[in-house]
Amino acid sequence: MDRRSFVFTGAAALAGCWLPVRGGPPAPATPRRPVPTPAQFAWQRDELAMFCHFGVNTFTDREWGDGTENPAIFNPAALDARQWARAARAAGFRAMILTAKHHDGFCLWPTATTAHSVASSPWRGGHGDVVREFVDACRAEGLRAGLYLSPWDRNNPAYGNSPRYNDLYCDQLTELLTRYGSIAEVWFDGANGEGPNGRKQVYDWPRFWSTVRRFQPDAVIFSDAGPDVRWCGNERGAAGDPNWSTVNPAVVTYPGESGPQVIPSLQHGDPAGSVWRPAEADVSIRPGWFYHPAENEHVRTVESLLDLYFSSVGRNAKLLLNVPPTREGLLYHSDVERLAAFRARRDAVFAHDLAAGADSGWTRTSARTAELSLELAAPATATVARIEEPVAHGQAVARYTLYGSDGADWSVLTRGTTIGYAKLDRFPSTRVRKIRLVIEEAAAPPAPVVMRLYAGA
């Protein structure tokens, strides 16, 4: 997105959606708070991305390979990456990420760096390229393509010989970032175990990140330490509450770092943080990350997927849902059906904004408190609220209470902490005519927010 259009969009929203603004104490001048780059904003606006764990583990029925796998086992005879992308798009996903190389070191593209790749497999007669088919499928379906490249490599003998392996890893990154056109996200895993020589590698993270910046300057870089987007601190798909998009970069300086403040920082961010680094919440639709036939009857329910949406996107994060291809190279039919049902369930919940056309007003009540009031065109029964800060101008809200009234007494619908890009609140079915959002605490003068109300389903 062009920076000028990004800023204009935020300004237009402020002008068009949140007036009138009423008085109150003027906000004091404060230092400029961190804001997202256009790439970070576009990344979060996707809301949903699909992870595809695929490789030799798919054929060995393991989660972590040890690097001794024979490439001959990799032969997904019916591989159809377009089927993956169609299922993702139909379910409302806007991006996909492929494990181009997992910890076993097997590369899904014909790399010059190792023989442990698809070029040594019988698939497509040794001339196949999963990464190429994946990227092309994403583009054909209008999805943004991302790539995961594990730095841990349990096959390559250079692993553990730091300078040599870091050179090789950067060569692999360079191949992926220069052969396949635009890449939207580069996903770095912090795993750092032993290689085939029993040694651990000292990763050159600044060099890895600069390689991405050199060849894909518009890509967002994911890792525990960003620098663009961060892990949410668990693999349950649950962002923290509160969840700030700002962090103190000195707390988590490299992926895989340990320390008492690391997980709290990943989960919650920091209201006083100096950099913008929003959270991505990763989780699998199945118990495992790779496909296992024994898990075919253990695909997440629609309600479980909806809960994940509320605990990730609904807590100012992005949901990265893993849906692993089978040994045939297809998404399993029950997974595809569950994705479609997940889309239908979301559509039912968010079908009609009860607050559309409501009379609204925004009042500053002090330097760091404010109220949003809504009066609906007619009484309605609501169960869900979506609240959004104009994050193009930063994140500020730290605590709020949402009240509702049917025209007489006011009752508390819900209480919350941070808002950010989006906060989704569920509350008992309540008939309302008026709504009042009271911002009780903020890290900076809060800007006018947007609220939508839904009956749910």
Residue ranges and their predicted role:
Residues 5-24:
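N-terminal export signals
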Residues 8, 24-403, 412-417, 421-423, ...:
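Mature catalytic domains of secreted/periplasmic carbohydrate-active enzymes
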Residues 405-407, 456:
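Inter-blade boundary loops/turns of WD-repeat beta-propellers
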Residues 429-431:
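Surface-exposed, short loops/turns at beta-strand junctions within beta-sandwich domains
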Residues 434-436:
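Short, conserved beta-strand segments of beta-strand-rich sandwich/propeller modules, principally
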Residues 443-456:
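Edge beta-strands of jelly-roll/beta-sandwich modules across compartments, strongly enriched
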